[in-house]
């Protein structure tokens, strides 16, 4: 008896789940032009009332409304229209569907120029903003004699790591002569290929010391100027002191002569 009741309960749950799934069925449509895409989702039936719609690109919400219709659209223009989208009918679990907009890969350098010191390590980074995802990454150094493909682990200094969305080139123990230049990252997907360029500049080990040496030189020049100025000023001060000391002696001599003259006149008068 218990087994029969369990079977009936399971059957009821399956029917309820099937009814719910049927109620949440969503049909999708993707229409595109040269630079635009129109995404459409239609909820066929719904046991519960729709309170709104939400559109996502990946995990980012790009549009949301509180309309109650069983139909929703999202229009996208520009180069960033490619990717994976989702439409959701609210409240949650009312209905949901996924739409994809395929396009050629668009490879971008996170930083178009990198600066590092000789002997240090540096990381060059490229990312892909496209769908389908990049399936193959290649790094090479741009040269007049021909592009040089960089293999992972080559010279024990070049290491490459990548995922579907980005690729990194790690260079260790930078060489001032051979490492500076332009590095290109190439990404290929089912829709095509694209590349971006990163310029690497390597500074000498002494480059960081130049500002400090400049400050030291300025201080030395200033000290030298002050020393010369003080040395030239001291003889003038000594001469001024000697002149000031001789003046009182000359004045006292005049007083002595005046006193002698008075005594002579007094004697003559007597």
From Swiss-Prot:
Limits of the Ig-like V-type domain: 105-203
Membrane topology: Single-pass type I membrane protein
Keyword Endoplasmic reticulum: yes
Any Pfam family: Ig_3
Transmembrane segments: 208-228
GO cellular component: axon; basolateral plasma membrane; endoplasmic reticulum membrane; plasma membrane
Alphabetical GO biological process terms: angiogenesis; axon guidance; dendrite self-avoidance; endothelial tube morphogenesis; homophilic cell adhesion via plasma membrane adhesion molecules; positive regulation of endothelial cell migration; positive regulation of vascular endothelial growth factor production; protein localization to plasma membrane
Extracellular side: 22-207
UniProt cross-references to InterPro entries, sorted A to Z: Ig-like_dom (IPR007110), Ig-like_dom_sf (IPR036179), Ig-like_fold (IPR013783), Ig_sub (IPR003599)
Summary of the function given for this chain in its UniProt record: Signaling receptor for cyclophilins, essential for PPIA/CYPA and PPIB/CYPB-dependent signaling related to chemotaxis and adhesion of immune cells. Plays an important role in targeting the monocarboxylate transporters SLC16A1/GLUT1, SLC16A3, SLC16A8, SLC16A11 and SLC16A12 to the plasma membrane. Acts as a coreceptor for vascular endothelial growth factor receptor 2 (KDR/VEGFR2) in endothelial cells enhancing its VEGFA-mediated activation and downstream signaling. Promotes angiogenesis through EPAS1/HIF2A-mediated up-regulation of VEGFA and KDR/VEGFR2 in endothelial cells.
Record-given protein name: Basigin
Organism per entry: Oryctolagus cuniculus
């Amino acid at each position: 008896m218990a087994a029969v009741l369990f079977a009936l309960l399971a059957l009821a749950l399956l029917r309820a789940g099937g009814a719910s799934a049927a109620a949440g069925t969503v049909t999708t449509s993707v229409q595109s032009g040269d630079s635009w895409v129109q995404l459409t989702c239609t909820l066929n039936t719904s046991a519960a009332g729709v309170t709104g719609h939400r559109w996502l690109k990946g995990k980012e919400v790009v549009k949301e409304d509180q309309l109650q219709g069983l139909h929703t659209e999202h229009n996208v223009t520009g180069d960033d229209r490619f990717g994976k989208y989702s439409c959701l009918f609210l409240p949650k679990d009312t209905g949901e569907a996924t739409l994809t907009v395929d396009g050629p890969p668009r490879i971008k350098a996170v930083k178009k120029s990198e600066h590092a010191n000789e002997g240090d390590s540096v990381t060059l980074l490229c990312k892909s903003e496209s769908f389908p995802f990049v399936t193959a990454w290649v790094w090479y150094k741009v040269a007049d004699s021909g592009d040089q493909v960089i293999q992972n682990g080559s010279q024990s200094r070049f290491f490459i790591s990548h995922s579907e969305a980005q690729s990194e080139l790690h260079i260790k123990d930078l060489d001032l002569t051979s490492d500076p230049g332009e590095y290109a990252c190439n990404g290929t997907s089912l829709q095509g290929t694209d590349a971006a360029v990163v310029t690497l500049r390597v500074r000498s080990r002494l480059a960081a010391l130049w500002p400090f040496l400049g400050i030291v030189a300025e201080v030395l020049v200033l000290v030298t100027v002050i020393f010369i100025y003080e040395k030239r000023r001291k003889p003038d001060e000594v001469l001024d002191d000697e002149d000031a000391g001789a003046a009182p002696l000359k004045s006292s001599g005049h007083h002595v002569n005046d006193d002698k003259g008075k005594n002579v006149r007094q004697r003559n008068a007597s």
